[in-house]
């Protein structure tokens, strides 16, 4: 199908604003009981109030489809408890469980609705079993959550240019992540592992070409399913006394399933990743070494995207004139310009090729001097990952 659109000239002006008020209170309790039982428990409460707005004009006229004002309130309350214990000389076990209540309410265009409300459980389990002094088995199960950015949850339409837009999604839900991993450590240096990741309401931004107008837009959506299964191996080795290397290989099966606008997708892809880290000792007397690292990721998928393979070659010259005190590093990243992502979409009415032309090459010089030991106070950092546009 070929559509003929008349040539037009448009002028777009937009002013956006975001105000966020965030309050968080948490309490943690730890105690060690007899026979090495360590117990911890606690609670946390968080409130957030977000005010997003944008005023957009096309050719000096207000664009009502891209002008909005939206308020959002989120409430979070959680409890957690856990323990850790060493059993004999071989087994170390720790486990915890947290229960968290979340509620989000949106007020936009005179209408209020509850975006999400409910209780979710987040278990954690870590087991380490020493088979003998040289071999060990480690098993880990963990869970976490990821919230969408506040701006992505608004009813906004932001113009990248007169053709491309970024649209918000006021129906985005938090993503829950469950991860399982088992590693076998052989001879204290070789690592062989299996892993599986399951994502509920997986959040990703996809690209859609409008079938009724000369327009395309990006929008973050929740996938129905995103699973990753894989195996990995870490092989360290030395070449003579001057070269120390570590080779990491992994094979993965990725599965994406969901509906984006009017495009259902159910896709699977096998791909691999290779990494090689090398340290060349140039002078032991002068504490001078060269680091050369290479990474390659084979072609994969992301929703309706086909993603080309990417690679990165980096190098760094490290000099320690005063061991454990003064270090100087000259480092270069993406020396061969291999991190330029390329994606392709090939669906009925949706065909596109995209290359990110941003230059990710960089050169940095770092000087580090250690004055002495410093006792850092434990403090909870403010999570700013949801701020901004």
Annotate the PLM regions.
Residues 45-51, 99-105, 113, 141-147, ...:
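Transmembrane beta-strands of outer-membrane beta-barrel pores
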Residues 274-320, 326, 331-337, 344-345:
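C-terminal beta-barrel architecture of Gram-negative outer-membrane proteins
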Residues 321-389:
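C-terminal beta-signal and adjacent terminal beta-strands/loops
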């Amino acid at each position: 199908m070929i559509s003929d659109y008349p040539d037009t000239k448009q002028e777009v002006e937009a002013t956006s604003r975001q105000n966020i008020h965030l309050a968080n209170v948490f309490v943690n309790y730890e105690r060690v009981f007899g026979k090495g039982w360590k117990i911890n428990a606690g609670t946390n409460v968080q409130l957030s109030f977000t005010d997003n707005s944008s005023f957009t004009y096309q050719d000096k006229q207000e664009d009502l489809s891209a002008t909005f004002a939206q308020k959002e309130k989120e409430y979070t309350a959680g409890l957690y408890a856990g323990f850790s214990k060493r059993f004999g000389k071989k087994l170390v076990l720790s486990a915890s469980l947290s229960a968290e209540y979340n509620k989000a309410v949106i007020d936009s265009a005179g209408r209020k609705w509850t975006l999400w409300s409910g209780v979710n459980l987040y278990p954690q389990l870590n087991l380490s079993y020493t088979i003998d002094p040289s071999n060990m088995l480690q098993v880990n199960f963990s869970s976490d959550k990821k919230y969408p950015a506040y701006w992505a949850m608004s009813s906004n339409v932001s113009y990248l240019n007169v053709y491309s837009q970024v649209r918000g999604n006021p129906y985005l839900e938090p993503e829950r992540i469950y991860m399982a991993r088992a590693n076998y450590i052989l001879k204290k240096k070789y690592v062989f592992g299996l892993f599986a990741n399951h994502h509920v309401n997986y959040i990703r931004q996809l690209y859609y070409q409008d079938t009724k107008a000369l327009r395309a837009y990006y929008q973050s959506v929740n996938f129905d399913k995103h699973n990753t299964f894989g195996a990995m191996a870490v092989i360290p080795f030395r070449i003579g006394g001057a070269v120390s290397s570590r080779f990491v290989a992994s094979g993965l099966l990725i599965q994406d399933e969901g509906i984006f606008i009017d495009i259902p997708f159910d896709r699977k892809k096998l791909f691999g990743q290779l990494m090689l880290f090398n340290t060349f000792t140039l002078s032991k007397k002068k504490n001078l070494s060269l680091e050369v690292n290479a990474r390659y990721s084979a072609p994969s998928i992301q929703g309706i995207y086909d993603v080309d393979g990417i690679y990165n070659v980096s190098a760094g010259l490290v000099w320690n004139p005063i061991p454990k005190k003064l270090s100087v590093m000259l480092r270069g990243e993406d020396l061969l310009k291999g991190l330029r992502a390329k994606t392709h979409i090939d669906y009925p009415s949706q065909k596109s090729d995209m290359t990110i032309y941003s230059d990710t090459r960089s050169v940095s010089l770092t000087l580090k001097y250690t004055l002495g030991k410093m006792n850092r106070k434990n403090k909870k950092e403010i999570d700013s990952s949801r701020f901004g546009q």
